[in-house]
């Protein structure tokens, strides 16, 4: 369990003569922040231990890690250093303000992580992958999507589920369905035991259309591929994953699309 806390440093923005006047106050603030952070993390650890003891949580090995810095940067740095198989984060889910999307730590990690990220909305009960029966995989017919699909299936081999291949389109196009059908046939040969469906979802209002599809088809997890983009693209043209974490109460699994 990784927690990152941010300690604001005011001294650098103060005139030189005022730094000494604020130094003691700043040190006290930092001490107070550290005490609060340690207390909260210990309380969380005790809560997890209690749930493990009661049998509500599985008896697995875990550690608590505390880091100081900008949350998204420290999470990505820790991931690069320790190479976890997956990063699990929480989101506030549906009906959040769009302006919050700009400063979302989870959204930033999703777009920059090279490790799969599972984002779980706060009001969504999600205890284990054994309960996952239907996964929606969104594809744009990019070769990297196929690689990500392989990664998804190989990672979840011990579990039993079906997959719906989804393509977002502005208008109904027979060619899109033909391509989806071809992808389905390809993966059906690779994974004969896997139940695969495919569908095209209208892209004119894709968030609501996709939400309706998820409800109608009882989708447990939405999966999609993230691609490397520069900072201006991320700010002014938010990707599907960044939009969806604020408009869906379904867990979102994002897999980095590795180049061929």
Residue map of PLM features:
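Charged helix-capping and loop-helix junction motifs
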Residues: 102-105, 178-183, 236-241
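Short beta-strands and strand-loop turn motifs
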Residues: 88-91, 119, 165-167, 223-226
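Small/aliphatic-rich secondary-structure junction motif
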Residues: 1-27, 133-197, 219, 247, ...
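A short acidic, glycine-rich active-site loop
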Residues: 23-39
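Structural beta-alpha unit
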Residues: 6-9, 46-87, 190-238, 242, ...
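Active-site phosphate/pyrophosphate- and oxyanion-stabilizing loops and adjacent acidic/basic residues
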Residues: 107, 150-153, 185, 211, ...
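Intrinsically disordered or low-complexity boundary/linker segments at protein termini
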Residues: 59, 85-91, 97, 101, ...
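N-terminal membrane-insertion helices
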Residues: 34-45, 180
């Amino acid at each position: 369990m990784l927690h990152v806390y941010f300690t604001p440093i005011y001294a650098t923005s103060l005139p030189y003569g005022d730094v000494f006047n604020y130094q003691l106050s700043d040190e006290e603030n930092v001490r107070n922040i550290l005490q609060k952070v340690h207390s909260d993390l210990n309380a969380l650890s005790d809560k997890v231990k209690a749930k493990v003891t009661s049998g509500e949580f599985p008896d697995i090995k875990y550690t608590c890690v505390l880091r100081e810095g900008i949350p998204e940067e420290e999470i990505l740095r820790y991931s690069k250093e320790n190479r976890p198989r997956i990063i699990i984060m929480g989101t506030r889910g549906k009906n959040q303000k769009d302006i919050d999307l700009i400063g979302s730590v989870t959204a930033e990690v999703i777009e920059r992580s090279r490790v799969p990220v599972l984002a779980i909305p706060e009001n969504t009960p999600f205890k284990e992958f054994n309960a996952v029966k239907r996964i929606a995989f969104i594809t744009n017919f990019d070769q990297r999507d196929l690689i990500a699909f392989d990664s998804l299936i190989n990672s979840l081999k011990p579990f039993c589920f079906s997959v719906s291949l989804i393509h977002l389109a502005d208008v109904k196009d027979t060619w899109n369905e033909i391509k989806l059908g071809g992808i389905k046939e390809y993966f059906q040969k690779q994974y004969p035991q896997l139940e695969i469906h495919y569908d095209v979802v209208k892209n004119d209002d894709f968030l609501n259309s996709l939400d309706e599809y998820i409800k109608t088809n009882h989708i447990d997890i939405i999966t999609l591929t993230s691609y490397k983009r520069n900072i201006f693209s991320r700010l002014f043209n938010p990707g599907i994953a960044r939009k969806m974490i604020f408009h869906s109460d379904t867990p979102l699994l994002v897999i980095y699309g590795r180049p061929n």
